[in-house]
From Swiss-Prot:
<comment type="similarity">
    <text>Belongs to the universal ribosomal protein uS9 family.</text>
</comment>
<dbReference type="InterPro" id="IPR020568">
    <property type="entry name" value="Ribosomal_Su5_D2-typ_SF"/>
</dbReference>
<dbReference type="InterPro" id="IPR014721">
    <property type="entry name" value="Ribsml_uS5_D2-typ_fold_subgr"/>
</dbReference>
<dbReference type="GO" id="GO:0022627">
    <property type="term" value="C:cytosolic small ribosomal subunit"/>
</dbReference>
<keyword id="KW-0687">Ribonucleoprotein</keyword>
<protein>
    <recommendedName>
        <fullName>Small ribosomal subunit protein uS9</fullName>
    </recommendedName>
</protein>
<dbReference type="InterPro" id="IPR020574">
    <property type="entry name" value="Ribosomal_uS9_CS"/>
</dbReference>
<dbReference type="InterPro" id="IPR023035">
    <property type="entry name" value="Ribosomal_uS9_bac/plastid"/>
</dbReference>
<dbReference type="Pfam" id="PF00380">
    <property type="entry name" value="Ribosomal_S9"/>
</dbReference>
<feature type="compositionally biased region" description="Basic residues">
    <location>
        <begin position="120"/>
        <end position="134"/>
    </location>
</feature>
<dbReference type="GO" id="GO:0003735">
    <property type="term" value="F:structural constituent of ribosome"/>
</dbReference>
<dbReference type="InterPro" id="IPR000754">
    <property type="entry name" value="Ribosomal_uS9"/>
</dbReference>
<dbReference type="GO" id="GO:0006412">
    <property type="term" value="P:translation"/>
</dbReference>
<feature type="region of interest" description="Disordered">
    <location>
        <begin position="113"/>
        <end position="134"/>
    </location>
</feature>
<dbReference type="GO" id="GO:0003723">
    <property type="term" value="F:RNA binding"/>
</dbReference>
<keyword id="KW-0689">Ribosomal protein</keyword>
């Protein structure tokens, strides 16, 4: 028989996808099957870590859950945003009363910005080749 997982949320940002499981616990972190002291050990950049755990901070649930995260695609910045949305959605499964707080800080909104495709005849998505008058 499978063990009880807890609360689940999926988050996406750019090309990153995160599946987040919250289990009642004391704040352990497991990312892609590997144990970490904190999320900072995975993301390295403190700004990305702070961004990812923001939903736990604003809802005062920081030490109440163990995080089990499967994240792939994109870079660390996009993964941080995906984890953030996944945690916020999992917290809603835990308690619907947290919705106004999470909504106030815009944590339930999927950031729709994606990389614009490169067009032919241009060097990048919008950058045209250098123009010479003479």
């Amino acid at each position: 028989m499978a063990e009880v997982i807890g609360y689940y949320g999926t988050g996406r940002r750019k090309t990153a996808v995160a599946r987040v499981y919250l289990r009642p616990g004391e704040g352990k972190v497991k990312v892609n099957g590997k144990e970490y002291e904190s999320l900072n050990d995975y993301f390295k950049n403190p700004a990305w870590t702070k961004h990812a755990i923001e939903p736990l901070e604003v809802t005062n649930t920081l030490g109440k859950f163990d995080l089990v995260i499967r994240v792939n695609g994109g870079g660390l910045s996009g993964q941080s945003g995906a984890v953030r949305l996944g945690i916020a959605r999992a917290l809603l499964q835990y308690d619907q009363k947290l919705r106004p707080v999470l909504k106030k800080y815009k944590m339930l909104t999927r950031d729709p910005r994606e990389v614009e495709r490169k067009k032919y005849g241009l060097k990048k998505a919008r950058r045209a080749p250098q123009f010479s008058k003479r």
